[in-house]
Curated annotation (Swiss-Prot):
This is Glucosamine-6-phosphate deaminase. The active site is at residues 62, 128, 130, 135. One of its GO terms (biological process) is glucosamine catabolic process. Belongs to the glucosamine/galactosamine-6-phosphate isomerase family. NagB subfamily. SUPFAM superfamilies: NagB/RpiA/CoA transferase-like. Coiled coil: none annotated. Keywords: Carbohydrate metabolism, Hydrolase. Pathway: Amino-sugar metabolism; N-acetylneuraminate degradation; D-fructose 6-phosphate from N-acetylneuraminate: step 5/5. PANTHER family: GLUCOSAMINE-6-PHOSPHATE ISOMERASE. Its EC number is 3.5.99.6.
Amino acid sequence: MKVIKVENQVQGGKVAFEILKEKLANGAQTLGLATGSSPLEFYKEIVESDLDFSNLTSVNLDEYVGLDGDNPQSYRYFMQENLFNQKPFKESFLPRGVKDNAEAEVERYNQILADHPVDLQILGIGRNGHIGFNEPGTPFDSQTHLVELDQSTIEANARFFAKIEDVPTQAISMGIKNILDAKSIILFAYGESKAEAIAGTVSGPVTENLPASSLQNHPDVTIIADAEALSLL
């Protein structure tokens, strides 16, 4: 596990983009993408670059259940606004936030991941150590599944909604096994609120109580973080 300390998210985005260029030069075809504020500067680097992504495939980590892709709070909308509209991919897959038939969607998305092995997976990390929407207690052998969101996750994401009652309580997420199946992983972490989770991820015991600690079992993980997020290491 490699840890790179950066001044801020802008520098973090640039560092990650250099890693991406190296992976693309070595033949990477499929990117695993994340939402939230942590990867935004990385996506800006992609958008502003002259690289052609029209032959690449992307698969996203997760999506809220109950939000249509046209909903501004959905992760599909986020990806369209921040990346896909400006830099089209050949194919872009996200879980569908369908309420009525989540089990079928889980099966569909697991098949998509089987058909499109991820070369480089982008991650953020939750204050409780979640990656994707894999909350504490998620088995390390889990694949795509329906998640009941932890209250701390709902509270952390409430800033994106008019009120906390509007935050969905379920999501469909890649499982930890899906994430670990990626050839390479970049995890972004910024701010003091992530320090405890990062300390456990890097140097704590590998435990299902801290989902990100599973990354210690992966051969090619790069953590890009600021001083605050690294303050407990």
